[in-house]
Amino acid sequence: MNKFFLAPSILSADFARLGEDIKKVIDAGSDLIHFDVMDNHYVPNLSMGPMILESLRNYNITAPIDVHLMVKPVDNLIPQFAKAGATFITFHPEATLHIERTLNLIKENGCKAGLAFNPATPLNFLDYILEKLDLILLMSVNPGFGNQSFLPSTFNKLREVRKIIDANFSDILLEVDGGVKLDNIADIACAGANVFVMGSGLFKYSNYKLVIEKIRKKLEYAHSRSIH
């Protein structure tokens, strides 16, 4: 594993200048956009729907977009977000009665499929559907709000999922979301993550390019540690 992907979280962007801000962070060296969708039911917060995603595509945002559905139920929204321009659609196992059917629905609508795990969600769901996944998302905070601290218990979970992925010779992406900062991203990478959702840890800075250069250096260091 020698490629790392930065995924700025749209929740921390400037909503008054959303398209402009997202374009700036992509041009500064980000790889994809993390698009959080919350329903004030599955999680205690409310965010945006497919119209916002479609508007970003119309603004000529061409980078991959990972739509993270923190909603319940989930299936009726999948075709809408796929049509609006999602690249990945990621959902939580608690949000559907039939995980495999929901994964199939995502694929049928032309998107890559991800499964998200809250800090307290067990990993045994992976025993049944690993081969259908393109991405596994581990929440390193309890979902619903930004600017939370990274939960240290996530490290063991990351190592466990990395072993599962590698044991199956899989190229599934392993994403972590919550409290990812300059001072911990190298340790998170060494634990097995290769996609890093960054909210306030990136958007709070005025010079995105400079911060991303610093992040890349941290990740280069993590990669050098992992191969020795």
UniProtKB/Swiss-Prot annotation:
Gene Ontology biological process terms from the UniProt entry: pentose catabolic process; pentose-phosphate shunt
Keyword Glycoprotein: no
Binding site for a divalent metal cation: H34, D36, H68, D177
Residues annotated for substrate binding in this entry: S9, H68, D177, G178, G179, G199, S200
Textual note on the cofactor: Binds 1 divalent metal cation per subunit.
Keyword tags: Carbohydrate metabolism, Isomerase, Metal-binding
Residues the record marks as active site: D36, D177
Reaction catalyzed: D-ribulose 5-phosphate = D-xylulose 5-phosphate
EC numbers, comma separated: 5.1.3.1
PANTHER family documented for this protein: RIBULOSE-5-PHOSPHATE-3-EPIMERASE (PTHR11749)
HAMAP family: RPE
Protein name: Ribulose-phosphate 3-epimerase
Organism for this UniProt entry: Buchnera aphidicola subsp. Acyrthosiphon pisum (strain APS) (Acyrthosiphon pisum symbiotic bacterium)
Gene that encodes it: rpe
